[in-house]
């Protein structure tokens, strides 16, 4: 099957790696929360980390239908492992050194759509439009059932 998603990739200095990791996963959390979708984060333990990953967090959205959270994104810090494989180096004051790389799945549209509809569906079948999206919907606050 085909799975589409939007990724954010960062190549940075090692000393910036922790800061970027925090920013990236918070971007995903903020995006979902701005659309009134409850989310939580789960930091992966070292035994569950895939190859190359130094640190990883999953972002999960609440599914009212399933009555549980499901994964909608993840963020990983790969340290310098991926940069070593790709030979990505930084010219620093003390010579060349390997960069750090980070990957963040910001959104997988099918999963976001599911979370959006489930969390904004009203009892009468209409869908509430979160305030952040209303300017893009011509000021519409609700999509009415026809």
Region annotations inferred by a language model:
Residues 1-146:
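TRNA-recognition modules of translation machinery and tRNA-sensing kinases, especially anticodon-binding
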